[in-house]
């Protein structure tokens, strides 16, 4: 059994170094649904649990021959014999009985040949939006935050880093350098990040479209019975009526086998086939019905949440609670307001995922420095010109956080001493500005 599911083990392992670039709704699509469909494919193709997929009984025909013939040639049931009485031991199975080919209508069942292929293809379809988003995202978040998931312990390490297995906890000096990298990247990519948020929203909408397509396709694949499969299965569970599962996934079917007799005439053999494969099929599709229903509700709620972020991302209260939901922690409201006032939606989403990957200790440092250095995308059309301009003197609404270590000390030193003095000094001199790192 463990060997059967070894191929999906890599999608279930817990990794502390994994970088978050999407939300839980996205993960339900490309991780959980992908794994569920992959496991279903393995179950269908494995004979360890259900034995032979089909076993047919007929006098005068070798079993392996007729089994193979009836598996690749659709079996059928007689519609007239699919009555509304539940099957009981000793009674005739639904759809089985004598029939006249010229008068009676039959229902052919050929889908079971394609079930593993369809399930595997659907698993790939649920992974495609994630693959597209991962390509569009380009590893930007990972490049900035990789190795910083446990940086809350950095304050105790000072100048020495700590490695625990594959997990590396950086020293204080390394963390400070990473803060400077994040700050510079946010400023440098103000314009380049314009499409970042649009691609994320498109990928989330693509998840919903793909889910609706898979539900529609599955319904057609099962002859239009999938949409109502869940409610009908629950209803028939406690009634004497014929279960819809016995109609969609018949356990016993008929098969006609033709062969040449000794004299050359064609002989027809009426075979009764036990469909062990359908016992597994009905369980899989019942689970998929309830999972798809749950996933559809969650996906719609996720898109409603995305609409709220589009409408209220510049509201400081909404942002504070959103960041707290991403990862608990307290942030300075004045500094946060200063940053989001200068953010478009893409930059806001970039900050949101930074918060999802950074500790409170490090994210406070990032917000503190962005508060006074972030250009305004609505007014600062040339980011390069902004970077070449003299730094703006620090304002009182951006108070210095006493609990944070100094980052980029030459720049902050000039900021703190650059306010007008009693002697009429007007900020840093030209010689001081020349000392700033380029």
Curated annotation (Swiss-Prot):
Single GO biological process annotation from the record: phototransduction
Coiled-coil positions: none
Transmembrane residue ranges: 24-44, 59-79, 113-133, 284-304
PROSITE patterns registered for this protein in UniProt: PANNEXIN
Localization, UniProt: Cell membrane; Cell junction, Gap junction
Cytoplasmic topological segments: 1-23, 80-112, 305-438
One GO CC term, this protein: cytoplasm
Main location: membrane
Keyword hit for Coiled coil: no
Extracellular side: 45-58, 134-283
Bilayer topology annotation: Multi-pass membrane protein
Region (Disordered): 381-402, 415-438
InterPro entries linked: Innexin (IPR000990)
Keyword Ion transport: yes
Superkingdom of the source species: Eukaryota
Gene Ontology molecular function: gap junction channel activity
Annotated keywords: Cell junction, Cell membrane, Gap junction, Ion channel, Ion transport, Membrane, Transmembrane, Transmembrane helix, Transport
Low complexity bias spans: 418-431
Tissue occurrence: Expressed around gut lobes in embryonic stages 15-17.
Function per UniProt: Structural components of the gap junctions.
Similarity section: Belongs to the pannexin family.
PANTHER family linked to this entry: INNEXIN, INNEXIN INX7
Stated name of the protein: Innexin inx7
Gene name of this polypeptide: Inx7
